[in-house]
Amino acid sequence: MKDFANRIVYYESSRMSVSVRLCLSSIDKRVRLRDLTLVKEELQFFLDQKVPQVKFIDRTFNCNHQHAMEIWKYIQEHDNGITNFHFEISADLLNGEELALLAKMRPGLVQLEIGVQSTNLQTLEAVRRHTNLDKLRHAVVRIHSEYNIHVHLDLIAGLPYEDMGSFIRSFNDVYSMRPQQLQLGFLKVLKGSYLEEMAQTYGIVYQSCPPYEVLYTKWLSYGDIIRLKRVEEMVELYYNSNQFTHLIPVLQSRFENPFAMYDKLADFYHEKGYFVHTPARAYRYQVLLEFAQQEDPDGMELYRELAVYDLYLRENAKSRPAFAWDDKT
C-alpha cells in the first residue's frame, strides 16, 4: 500500500449516460450514483494512505446537489493536510450552500475543473449544453474571492458555429475570469457520440484514428487549427506555468485583447524558429523580453524589472540572469 503515497488516484462516484450533455436535475435517473457509505469508506482509505491527489472522473460531479455536498463535507471534515481532490463541475449549477462550503476548504484541498467549452450560445446549443454563462461567471468570481481553490477553465476549438472570431471572443471571455489554468483543447469526435452523428452536417473533418481530433470544420480551416495549436503552446508556457504572473498582465495590457498577445507571441516564436519545448526557464524569459522589445521598446525597463521579479519569486537563482539590469552603483 505504500505505493499510494506517490500516485494520483482516478476515482468515480457517479456515472452519466453518454447521451446526456449536462445534467439539469438532481433527480435525473440517467445518472447512476454510487452508495455514499462505500464512497466515504474508499475516500478514507485514500486519506489514510496520504494519496497526493484523488481525481474524480465524474463528468459533472455536482449535478446532484446532495451527493456533491456529502462528499465535499466529508473531505473537509477528514482533511489530512496532504491530499488534494480534483472535481469536474458545472459552475452555473453551484448554489449558495455549495459555494459557502467550498469557501471553508483548506487552501489546496480542492481544485475545480470547469468546462466552459465556448461562450457562443449557438455553439453551446449545438452541442446540447445549457450553460447559464452569467451564473458561471458569478460562481467563478465568488470562488476566486476566497483565494483557496485552484480553478481550471476549459475551452474547446472546433465546435459547430465557432469561427475564428467567435473563438477569440470565447478565449477573451474565459481569460477575463482569471483562472489559474486556461485549458485550450481541441474537439475529439468520439465513436458513438452525438458529434460523430452530426460530423457531416457540421463539416467536421477529424483524424480517422485515436484521438479522433478535429482537423477542420465549416467554420475553422486547417490553418486556423494550426494557428490555435500555436496559441495553445504560448498559453501553456506563459500563462498556465504561473511563472510570469507580474510580467504577462502588464505586457498583455499593451495589446487589444489577451488573445492578440498570445497569437502574436506564437507568430514571433514561429518566425524566429525558437524552441517551444525547452526545459530552460531562463530561455523563455529571454524570448519573452525579445518579443516585448519588438512590440513595446519604450517599456523595456519595466519589463526587465518584472521579469527579474518573477524569476526570483520562483527560482533560487545562484547568479543574475543575462537580461537583468546592472545594479552596481
Predicted regions, residues:
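Radical SAM enzyme core and accessory elements
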Residues: 233-329
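Glutamate identity and glutamate-enriched acidic tracts
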Residues: 12, 41-42, 70, 77, ...
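General structural signal for secondary-structure boundaries
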Residues: 1, 35, 59, 90, ...
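Radical SAM [4Fe-4S] cluster-binding motif and immediate context
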Residues: 1-145
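Conserved C-terminal portion of the radical SAM core fold
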Residues: 40, 47-57, 82-88, 106-118, ...
